[in-house]
């Protein structure tokens, strides 16, 4: 069994994905990591050790270090060498294997020039034939920032404002103010903002009202490293000005003039802003009209898609209607087939597309962790090839709390809200694959100008188990009735997108009518 030296999140998903062989027997060894997290300083090197128990040579084993996903990995060592093609781009040239003790089962992952993004959990994974074991190793990253600096500003009311600043801290530091007698007092305001590298810039302000205060110190502490930096400032008595009547009079006059100026600017803004707002609303309305037209034209090419059980991963359970699928912890005993996925928990649709336009919808509901789209019929189904267009996958996914297009560097998708149903439109000749949020018909993402070679098939993948299935929506009975605008670029005239044959009474513009209807999956899975 695997040894987990420190507590962590459930790793059910990673364990399921790693079951890529028909039968994984219990390994004749354990994998043991360090009992405590490894502490590393930004810019320095870190080593994450793990070992086999009992001691045995690991030269003939596959060794894989990975983070949240098995592939791409931080480092893969197989057949006596490192597999750079399977390595995450951010670790290329930085992550190497320390194998001085590999003959005794002792190895370590060395990360050069540690970054803030390296902080977190790593999995040390050993595999021999059909057996594997793993252990978790936690890396904690820290950085001691610059020497703090205090700036002083004397306000008109006689109070003194001090601001203490410093850069380059990780994790977020603590700020503490002290008097010359060691008395502590809190900040009036604090801010901690990360830069592009994840290092925090801290700024803390305090108001000094006690004129007896002579010296004030600012301490910035990194609790993880147990270190702090300090700066002290002396407050001269001459810094406390006296308020005279003429200063008060000037302040009142300036305040009145400021209020009059603000009122004048606001009135002018209100006067000239009404017309541009109307134009923006008109442009936004036409933009929504174009999106609705694009989606409705796509539904004219709706096809009936069903799931192909011969391609389904053994942990995927298909419903009787071949329209719904869910991921389970248990593994089915299925016949070995070349077309079956044995590593990624995926399944293909039965339908094959070699030309034309095709549209279908998938009910994702409120389940998390999925990927859907289109792939080549001959994609690699054995092993952990990355799901990218270069490998024949064109898909979008929900993973963790984010939506992504599965491009080589994974493109984040800033959606207005989580889609409960996703429409997929394939235009083979144009080389376009579009995804729509069927909550409102808006675009999610489009792969454009792709040169397809060979048959394409619908593609579905689940990253986490649960009772809620992924469901393909069936085609509604009867002919589809959608009005198509002859010239979609000419929106100078308001052309309603109402169903043909109905009256032209106004309808709720936010209500979308699809050629596909939702389905309730069967109560039981096969």
From Swiss-Prot:
GO terms for biological process: regulation of cytokine production; T cell receptor signaling pathway. Seems to associate with xanthine dehydrogenase/oxidase. One of its GO terms (cellular component) is extracellular space. Residues 517-526 have a biased composition (Polar residues). This is Butyrophilin subfamily 1 member A1. N-glycosylated. May function in the secretion of milk-fat droplets. May act as a specific membrane-associated receptor for the association of cytoplasmic droplets with the apical plasma membrane. Inhibits the proliferation of CD4 and CD8 T-cells activated by anti-CD3 antibodies, T-cell metabolism and IL2 and IFNG secretion. It comes from Homo sapiens. Residues 504-513 have a biased composition (Basic and acidic residues). It comes from the Eukaryota. Belongs to the immunoglobulin superfamily. BTN/MOG family. It is a single-pass type I membrane protein.
